[in-house]
């Protein structure tokens, strides 16, 4: 019985030692990390806030266009990947015009007349979907070409206007301004002299005066009837020239 009692004591002591070792190890390693919750933890919205059928793809910042197929629940048509959201929105409009015509819901109202898209209504199957995708891509490419051509023409006309030769109108220098201002009083004075001389030039006027002084005076009249009356002159002759 002593042997059995000793074995029981040894077993109890060994169990206590193992329990103490496990507790020490758990305390040293710290608490266990919490379990990660299942399911999707982070949702990032990729759809464009304004345009229909447009969403961002990847970190490169490109935009994709994907439209719902009318009359087919859950089916979508992949139109393509584009550099800007506006291009993807135009592609959406082209695809909807090809499938729905005038009743299509568009991102841009002017897409109805700016995009040249042939009408290709979707049949009972999906045979027309590749044609719709091709027509939408071609319409967007043509729209971009027309926009680039218009921008190039505008830039060319602006360059031509900036490099046009200056006008042929004379440019007056400061000296010319002084000369013109100085000549204005002279012209006015000449006009005033012309008015004073009865429309004659000054040199002709003074020449006529000198010529008049050199001419012989006319002979005196034989009678005084033309010069005096009977009471004023008394019949005496008057000499007009000395």
From Swiss-Prot:
Database matches in SUPFAM superfamilies: DNA-binding domain (SSF54171)
Keyword terms of this UniProt record: Activator, DNA-binding, Nucleus, Stress response, Transcription, Transcription regulation
Localization terms from the record: Nucleus
Pfam families reported in the protein's UniProt record: AP2 (PF00847)
InterPro entries assigned to the protein according to its UniProt record, in alphabetical order: AP2/ERF_dom (IPR001471), AP2/ERF_dom_sf (IPR036955), DNA-bd_dom_sf (IPR016177), DRE1A-I (IPR045277)
Purpose of the protein: Transcriptional activator that binds specifically to the DNA sequence 5'-[AG]CCGAC-3'. Binding to the C-repeat/DRE element mediates high salinity- and dehydration-inducible transcription.
Family: Belongs to the AP2/ERF transcription factor family. ERF subfamily.
Protein name per its UniProtKB record: Dehydration-responsive element-binding protein 1J
Native source organism of the sequence: Oryza sativa subsp. indica (Rice)
Gene (UniProt): DREB1J
């Amino acid at each position: 019985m002593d042997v059995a009692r000793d074995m029981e004591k040894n077993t109890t002591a060994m169990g206590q030692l193992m329990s103490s070792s496990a507790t020490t190890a758990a305390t040293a390693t710290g608490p266990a990390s919490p379990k990660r919750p299942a399911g999707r933890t982070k949702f990032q919205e990729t759809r464009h806030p304004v345009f229909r059928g447009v969403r961002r793809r990847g970190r490169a910042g490109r935009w994709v266009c994907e439209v719902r197929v009318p009359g087919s629940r859950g089916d979508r048509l992949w139109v393509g990947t584009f550099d800007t959201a506006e291009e993807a929105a135009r592609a959406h409009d082209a695809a909807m015009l090809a499938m729905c015509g005038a009743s299509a819901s568009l991102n841009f109202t002017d897409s109805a007349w700016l995009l040249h898209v042939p009408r290709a209504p979707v049949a009972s199957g999906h045979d027309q979907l590749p044609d719709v995708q091709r027509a939408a891509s071609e319409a967007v490419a043509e729209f971009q070409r027309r926009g680039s051509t218009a921008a190039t023409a505008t830039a060319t006309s602006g360059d031509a206007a900036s490099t046009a030769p200056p006008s042929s109108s004379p440019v007056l220098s400061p000296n010319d301004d002084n000369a013109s201002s100085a000549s204005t009083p002279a012209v006015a004075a000449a006009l005033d002299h012309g008015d004073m001389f009865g429309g004659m030039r000054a040199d002709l006027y003074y020449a006529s005066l000198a010529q008049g002084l050199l001419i012989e005076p006319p002979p005196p009249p034989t009678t005084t009837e033309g010069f005096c009356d009977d009471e004023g002159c008394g019949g005496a002759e008057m000499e007009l020239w000395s």
